Each structure stands twice: as structure tokens, then as C-alpha cells.
Amino acid sequence: MLGCSLAMGTVANAQEGDSPVAASQEGNGNKHFMVYYRAWRDVTMKGVNTDLPDDNWISMYDIPYGIDVVNVFSYVPSGQEAAAQPFYDKLKSDYAPYLHARGIKLVRGLDYSGVMVDGFKTWIAQQGKNVDSATESDYDAYADHVIETYMTSVGLDGLDIDMETFPDAAQVAISDQVITARAKRIGPKSDNPVGTTFLYDTNGSYTAPFKIVSDCFDYVAYQQYGSDSNRTAKAAATYEQFIDSTKFVPGLTFPEEGDMNNRWNDATEPYLDSHFYDVASYSYDHNLGGMFVYALDRDGRTYS
């Protein structure tokens, strides 16, 4: 199921000025293959969020066929915004139109605490109000602000909530309203469910921030790096209390260069003994929603 290697991409080692002709690809029903694209390794973004000595070589023209969603993943440290801007300019003017022509949607991850909760607190305070006095109109206005800031301003189609914490009831009360407002605009409950995407990605089974708003999302992307299908089965059973199995999408990772701490070892040899084969087989056999892969440019690489 995961024979989609980077070597099968449209252009090998595309340079910044290349503009390949996009060939359309057929969809795969309700099965998804999402990849996380590490923007700081793009050929247009140099010296941002990394001290690796080797040159960036990948571009979004290199993304293989067979993928239906690209998660644009990037953290830009304070003071490095100018160095990162060429990537976002290229994303809007060239990369996004090219990938759209191939039938691919692009989303961007947002930190749950930073945007769903603390971001709203900061924004509502700037309006001279507080959480207790916030109205539905305030949540709607904040949704418009977030969508413009993180999505439409760079030509993307959706957003992805990255949940890796354990919010309390007060925080969940805020995020439920933030998510509900955003779901009016993007995702399956919006006026444009086909052209937009709203995802929930998590590495745990803490469902308090999910259960009330579960119908707002296209699917759950479950980060289970370093784990086999036993974990897939347990997590799928938890989330299937709220969503259909076809909306549960487990994910693994290729090895990130120079990472001395996170040795997930998902892509090992022999392939038939690897987590990739095991989880892909389980996803197929149990009618899950597909799979996702983090760090697609590290296919076939090692941690060195």
C-alpha cells in the first residue's frame, strides 16, 4: 500500500524555477494518503528552523502521485520570518496551483493550545472583551481571522488541529466553540465540503476535546510513530465511538536526519517485518481511512 516512493515523484530534485506540467490523478474513494511536507527543508527556505549543514534539495514539485492531501508543516522561529517568506510566496503562486491541478488538497497544522485556546483568549482581549463575554459572532470573527491568517493567505484548502495535550474542561469549552465556528467555513459541515478540508490529528486517545465536535472533521489522523498495528487497533476502537472507521487514518514516519532522540524505526528492513507493512495491512484489512506519512523526503534514508 505504501509503494509510493519519492523516486516516483513528478520531477527529481526540482529546482526553484521549475514549473512542471501537472497530470491529474484519480481519487481513491474514501481512502486517504496524506503526507507531511517539512517546509524548512524546501529548496526555497534556507537556514530556517535547522542547523543542518547540507543544502535543501526538495521542492513541492517532487511530491509523488497517489497522495491526496499534503500537510504543510513548518515552525518559523522568531527572527527568521524573512528567510521563510520565499517559501510561502512560492507556495501561493506556484506550488499550490500545481498541486491543485493534480487533485491534491493542502492543509496546515495548528497547535491546539496555541490557536484553539490561547489564541482565542489573546484575540478576544484585543477586542476589549473576555472569554466569559464572548458571543457566537466573536467566535465566527475569530474563525475568519484564523482561516485568513493560516490558510487562504497562502492558497491552502484546509486546516489541521494538532492535539498532543490534555486540556481541562474550561479549555475544551473554548475549543469546542472555536472549532464549531470554523466548521461552518471549512470541512464536511461547511458550505464547501468538497473544496475544503478540516482535520484533527493527535498522538493520543484523550477524547474530551474531540467528542462533542467529532462531526466537524473530515477525518482523524492518528500519530502512532514507532508502533505496530496493536496500537492502531486500540486507538481505532476508541475513536470509533464517535466516527466511522473510514475516518480514522493512522500514520507513521520516515527517519528524520540527525534526530538523536526519536528513533521510531517504522521504515525497517525487511519490509514485510516493518511497522509500515503491518499498519498499512491492518488499515486495508479493517477498512480504515488510509494512512499518512511524516517527512516524506526521508523515504529510504537513515537517522544520520
Predicted regions and their residues:
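Sec-dependent N-terminal signal peptides
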Residues: 1-3
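Chitinase-like catalytic core of GlcNAc-active glycosidases
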Residues: 23-276, 285-288, 297, 301-304
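Sec-dependent signal peptide cleavage junction
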Residues: 6-23
